[in-house]
Amino acid sequence: MNTIKILIGLLGIFLFSLSGIVSAQSDATTQLSQLLSNFRTYQAKFNQITFDGQDRVIQQSHGRVMIMRPGRFRWETDSPTKQIIITNGKTLWVYDVDLSQATQQPLAQKTNINPASLLSGSVKDLKQKFTITISPTSDAATFQLVPRLGKSLNFNWIRLKFSKKQLTEMTVLNNLDERSIFQFSQIKVNAPLSSTLFEFKPSRGIDVVKQ
C-alpha cells in the first residue's frame, strides 16, 4: 500500500502553521479547528521513511509538498522514483514520470472522505470524522487523529507534530501496521503560489488512465 496516497485528502486538511504554543487545558478539536484558519499556503521539503510491523525499513523517499487552501495540493517525490500527485480540489492526478503514465479520478472517490467539509475546519466536522487528542510540551504539540470511519480510510491514526510554530513531522499508521514518518524542512507558510501548480495537463505521449 502506498502511504502517500493515503495522505491525499489529509495533507491539504492539516498542513498549517501553529500560531502559538497550545495548552493542555484547551479542547484539542477546538484548537485544531482554530489553527486551520491560520494558513493559506504551505510549502516544504520532506523526507519519508516507512517501517513494517517489525520496525524494518521498507521504503524511503524525499521530495516537496505544496498546498493552497481550499483543497489544492501538489506532492512531488524525487526518489526512489519520480512521481507527482496533484489535485485542484476536484480531480486527482497521479503522474508516474518514469512510466509516462498518469491516473485521473475524482478526489472524493480516492479519499472516501469529503475534503471540502474538513477544510472548513469546523469543530462539528472534525468531531464527526475523528477522535482528536493533544500532547503538548513547553515548545511543541502533537495532535493524534483517529478516524471514526475505521478502515474505510486505510489508516489507524495520524499524528501531527508542531515545533517552533510550524508543522515539522507527520506520522501515519496504516491498516497493514506500517508506520510512515514524514519530516518537513525549509517550510514556507502563506508565501505566494500560482494556481497553475495545482492543475495537470498531460503532454503528448503520456498514457492517461481514468478511474
UniProtKB/Swiss-Prot annotation:
Compartment annotation: Periplasm
Annotated signal peptide: 1-24
GO cellular component, one term: outer membrane-bounded periplasmic space
Swiss-Prot/TrEMBL keywords: Chaperone, Periplasm, Protein transport, Signal, Transport
Source domain of life: Bacteria
Record-level GO BP terms: lipoprotein localization to outer membrane; lipoprotein transport
Gene3D superfamilies for the chain: Lipoprotein localisation LolA/LolB/LppX
NCBIfam families (UniProt xref): lolA (TIGR00547)
Role played: Participates in the translocation of lipoproteins from the inner membrane to the outer membrane. Only forms a complex with a lipoprotein if the residue after the N-terminal Cys is not an aspartate (The Asp acts as a targeting signal to indicate that the lipoprotein should stay in the inner membrane).
Family the entry assigns: Belongs to the LolA family.
Subunit structure: Monomer.
Protein name, entry field: Outer-membrane lipoprotein carrier protein
Organism for this UniProt entry: Coxiella burnetii (strain CbuK_Q154)
Gene: lolA
